[in-house]
């Protein structure tokens, strides 16, 4: 790689592409490929690549971007038309990380560019090579090449170029045609003009576009008011009287007889419309009075119920008490089981005075046991021979081997309290033995002559 890099000319420009997958630092050969480098730097200064995506990825071959449409068919150069391919004998596609202009055979270079992922010698002399990716940013290019792709070599989630930054500009005479802010302003104005045209069309047609949301800055559409329909006069004939009579009979059973008599009177005599209207009004008043009486009865019933509740001790605002079941507590259940198993001793805490008395009582009993054991040991030492000469109580034989110790064994009559009178005497004291050995060794070494020369011994004595 070092030898390959040394063959390439020195870079004279630097640009950083800030993507969603990390930065990509590109060094440019502006002296060798001036037209392509000027085009690329000016597009970066104008913010032309901001928001564009990497629309094509071929693993182990290349990644391609720079198309504002995101389809691979768009893009334009700063010259207003595609420019020709530029080549140089020292610039060849022999490794990964090389940046070139994307173009077809019939068309020239526009704004699209690609970055190689391996050697592509078939492009030498056919594509414009104008830069290289440097530093650790090459790993961001490799990371982009490992994305998930669809059948058309397009990333499922394409990375986006957030912004571009020109670090070293070789062409000091470049003047951007427009800045990013100016282009955004123009785009907003065009969008506003299109909305205004649509609004004017809707105003002319007299319809409101209900599919479009209305905001505060938009002009309210005029609402066409439809004329109210005038009520046509109702001819109160005998047929309408029969229908009204049926409705009134179903609404109130109390005035059924009155309304039926009126109906028969109207049908037989064919009364005028004024008389019919007067009878209908009387029926309405009766209906209203009957409904009011029912409401009054309901109010009086509720008041009586409230009085009964107050007398019984309850209040009208009091809510029924809902008895909720207690939650199961596993800890209390286990404690109850443990208490029932009689493994726990329940009682009050003892006083300190009683504890001291019990401790002193236990100490005195222990001391008495030690004294009794010492007395028994003394008695055995004084009267042991006499006891052995007496006949045993089991066999009635004096000096019985079964009941007395004749072979240095312990008697069966020993109790657990005999160890209180026992004294431990060490047969061989290790400290005493060590001291004896040291003295013996010192006496043996007295007669051994010293290995040091006499001159050294004399010097030591003089000092």
Swiss-Prot record:
Low complexity compositional bias, start-end: 250-261
A GO molecular-function descriptor: peptidyl-prolyl cis-trans isomerase activity
A single BP term in Gene Ontology: mRNA processing
Compartment(s) where it occurs, according to its Swiss-Prot or TrEMBL record: Cytoplasm; Nucleus
Catalyses which reaction(s): [protein]-peptidylproline (omega=180) = [protein]-peptidylproline (omega=0)
Entries under InterPro entries matching the protein: Cyclophilin-like_dom_sf, Cyclophilin-type_PPIase_CS, Cyclophilin-type_PPIase_dom, Cyclophilin_A-like
EC top class named in words: isomerase
Compositionally biased intervals (Polar residues): 232-243, 262-271
Cited function: PPIases accelerate the folding of proteins. Catalyzes the cis-trans isomerization of proline imidic peptide bonds in oligopeptides. Involved in pre-mRNA splicing.
Family: Belongs to the cyclophilin-type PPIase family. CWC27 subfamily.
Protein name as catalogued: Peptidylprolyl isomerase cyp7
Originating organism: Schizosaccharomyces pombe (strain 972 / ATCC 24843)
Gene: cyp7
